[in-house]
């Protein structure tokens, strides 16, 4: 006869500290915890400081912190700001794009069948040159400016587990690889297709120490690549790949297009993201890695070291350190999922977008209309998760792109939030009432602009699924997780 014994285990991502000792968190730790919570539960962003404090103490019962300390920490990092003018942006530091229709036409004239690059109130943007019906294809960029391999998969690439260019996991048999000449004769690198091998024009000069190309030192490149991997310097690595392709194909317009895109120094972005402390939670260039213990001077040293290795990799490069910082900023401002698509890069942001994109398995990107677009209307994408509240959206936009969004949705949500925060009578609202009220307002404001689940899945971006607010208590408990999990263990 089989008996079942219930065992309760601790989740391996839980804080394993035990005992009654309390921890005094730093301001950075406080802010990072709140930001992570907001990303998990976007409705919590609109909670009043009293309610926010109550929930934080429940989440981190081993933390010793007062409500005022929490408030001051959030305020110092512009996360709980009563006045919009207290939020700094670096729009004035961004050099606008100088790319023209003629530059894009050199890549593919068909890209401009329905759109044109034009000056708008927000700088260069894409404007429809014809009416576009909802769901219609606007354009299709078949390739990015140059395909940039995924940095975090390079160890697998070196062992022949991933494609040397697109970084896709390979399932090809040895016979098929040899038959189609998809392997490298000098190392373990393989490619998943003939197209990827053809596009990987820099493999031999970057990866083989026997290369005699005077423009690139492969031994130093490998050191540079490993350093970028260790420190998660994705943008620096991307600039290196783009420059290497330019060196190998100097007659192409690759470098001209890349350096003509809008640009800002990476140093400016550090400052906007609070020296990569709490801002690291938002900073897309951090690749999800938080730098809670990295100060601005240390970041400067880190990037200076990266540039020194970059310069040694390309002995004849006349680029200086400031140029390098500007180019890494260029990549961060214009990239989508680690690739640079020069036409898509000109689409400005709105929290109520009228277009969406689909990434293709093999490098391409397609742009579709989310609603009817009239001739002369500007195309708009959302740069951030549209399910988040106005504070989180604006914070993420400020850190990554240097501006504060003033679209109708942001203005309406901000105005409502400020009325609640500034009214002393609202601080007496209970936790549940405040949570329900802010959730209802958020759902109402997003009703017309929320993307469908199909769109979110197609775009491949991170998104949040909300817990329904109208379920009974039994149902709610069935979907709520805590720090433990109970398993049924079979016993004989």
UniProtKB/Swiss-Prot annotation:
Source species of the chain: Kluyveromyces lactis (strain ATCC 8585 / CBS 2359 / DSM 70799 / NBRC 1267 / NRRL Y-1140 / WM37) (Yeast)
Coiled-coil positions: none
Gene Ontology molecular function: any one: histone H4K20 methyltransferase activity
PROSITE patterns linked: SET (PS50280)
Protein's UniProt name: Histone-lysine N-methyltransferase SET5
Primary gene name: SET5
Documented EC number(s): 2.1.1.-
Catalysed transformations (reactions): L-lysyl-[histone] + S-adenosyl-L-methionine = N(6)-methyl-L-lysyl-[histone] + S-adenosyl-L-homocysteine + H(+)
Subcellular location(s) of the protein: Nucleus; Chromosome; Cytoplasm
GO biological processes: methylation; negative regulation of gene expression, epigenetic
InterPro entries on file: SET_dom (IPR001214), SET_dom_sf (IPR046341)
Signal sequence interval, chain numbering: none
